[in-house]
Curated annotation (Swiss-Prot):
It holds the Pfam family PHD. Belongs to the Integrator subunit 12 family. This is Integrator complex subunit 12. Residues 347-358, 396-437 have a biased composition (Low complexity).
Length: 462
């Protein structure tokens, strides 16, 4: 480049240098004329744009010089003024560039004018070669280095090259394979272990590099180990704490089914119409139909009638001996015996006609029909039958009342036999129906205590 430019532009450069460094007033006009000649000839048209692009800052300095020195010329040539200024700057730059090559000529031309004009020209001549050299040299160095390294670096930055060999070359059996986890590219041969054809070509498979597979295995092991240790502990602790709480209520429920607190069963009532004592038998059968809490309340209220019954029996023992009901078979006896098949034994206690103090219709005891509560009073003439049993169906064993209330019940011998039969009949019924209300209350208290103890133990453990 430099040699060809020197051959073409030597005379113009010499003239331009002479005009620039001369002290005469005509130098500016001569420079302008030279510029017009070069424009007319069209020489160096290919070289101008590159110089314009490389060094625009010199335009301002030459503009100032040309405006100061040539106000007349610039006014006379308004159309070509801008082009003239640009071309003069180009000439100055060209001269500065060719100075090292043409030292002899420049020294001869400058020898006369250097002491007179050092301030105006030297800053331009010193600064221009520095800027031109740096821009050109740096540009060339950057281009060469960019051509050598930019492709690889760009490929690495964009993630288009192999991470191992840092190259983008792809062969038929050595394609670039991308890891789905870290998105790094590997040649099939560069990766260890080498990628198989199936892994590289099958689109259904997801390929991971060796480093990512190791990391994923470690993470999987870490995530699997912690739940394995506490899981058995939780399983072992929960049954120990919860099993007694879960199982015991089940057993309690089984026990409670035998004692239904809020269930009211409708039992067939034995309606016996036998003279004056019909109301007593009906009331006793109605009260005996209660079960659960109602029967428990009836039990508590039975204390009063039992005392009345005691007094009546003592007076009966002092009175006249009564005829046995086994010999007398009144009309109402068979009806009572058959009615006892309905599930309730009727209990009617009446006194002798000779005892004036005791009323003919004593209040019926409320404990009738209650299992486990058929306890006979000492030497009384009242028979208590809990459930329909074969012994209660026999008319000779159970003492019943006839229509008037005048005939008395059996004596001590008859009462004892009735007691034994009633006890024997009540014992299977008690075993069938399970615990009484008192026992169920005790069981409930025990359960409450157990629950409280367990709650306290849980609090202590926490």
């Amino acid at each position: 480049m430099a040699a060809t430019v020197n051959l073409e532009l030597d005379p113009i450069f010499l003239k331009a240098l002479g005009f620039l460094h001369s002290k005469s007033k005509d130098s500016a006009e001569k420079l302008k004329a030279l510029l017009d000649e070069s424009l007319a000839r069209g020489i160096d048209s290919s070289y101008r744009p590159s110089q314009k692009d490389v060094e625009p800052p010199k335009i301002s300095s030459t503009k100032n010089i040309s405006i100061k020195q040539e106000p007349k010329i610039s006014s006379s040539l308004p159309s070509g003024n801008n082009n003239g200024k640009v071309l003069t700057t180009e000439k100055v730059k060209k001269e500065a560039e060719k100075r090292p090559a043409d030292k002899m000529k420049s020294d001869i031309t400058e020898g006369v004018d250097i002491p007179k004009k050092p301030r105006l020209e030297k800053p331009e001549t010193q600064s221009s070669p520095i800027t031109v050299q740096t821009s050109k040299d740096l540009a060339m160095a950057d281009l060469s280095s960019f051509e050598e390294t930019s492709a690889d670096d760009f490929a690495m930055e964009m993630g288009l090259a192999c991470v191992v060999c840092r190259q983008m070359m792809v062969a038929s059996g050595n394609q670039l394979v991308e890891c789905q986890e870290c998105h790094n590219l590997y040649h099939r041969d560069c990766h260890k272990p080498q990628v198989t054809d199936k892994e590289a070509n099958d689109p259904r498979l997801v390929w991971y590099c060796a480093r990512c597979t190791r990391q994923m295995k470690r993470m999987a092991q870490k995530t699997q180990k912690p739940p394995q240790k506490p899981a058995p502990a939780v399983v072992s602790v929960t049954p120990a704490v919860k099993d007694p709480l879960v199982k015991k209520p089940e057993t309690k429920l089984k026990q409670e089914t035998t004692f239904l607190a809020f269930k009211r069963t409708e039992v067939k009532t034995s309606t016996v119409i036998s003279g004056n004592s019909s109301s007593a038998s009906v009331s006793s059968s109605v009260t005996s139909g209660l079960t659960g809490w109602a029967a428990f309340a009836a039990k508590t209220s039975s204390a009063g009638p039992s005392t009345a019954k005691l007094s009546s029996t003592t007076q009966n023992s002092t009175g006249k001996p009564a005829t046995s009901s086994a010999n007398q078979k009144p009309v109402g006896l068979t009806g009572l015996a058959t009615s006892s098949k309905g599930g309730i034994g009727s209990k009617i206690g009446s006194n002798n006609s000779t005892t004036p103090t005791v009323p003919l219709k004593p209040p019926p005891p409320l404990t009738l029909g209650k299992t486990g509560l058929s306890r006979s009073v000492s030497c009384d003439n009242v028979s208590k039958v809990g459930l329909p049993s074969p012994s209660s169906l026999v008319p000779g064993n159970s003492s019943q009342l006839s229509g008037n209330g005048n005939t008395g019940t059996s004596g001590p011998s008859g009462s004892t036999t009735s007691k034994t039969t009633s006890e024997s009949s009540s014992s299977p019924s008690a075993s069938l129906k399970g615990p009484t209300s008192q026992e169920s209350q005790l069981n409930a208290m025990k359960r409450l205590q157990m629950v409280k103890k367990k709650a306290a133990q849980k609090k202590l453990k926490k």
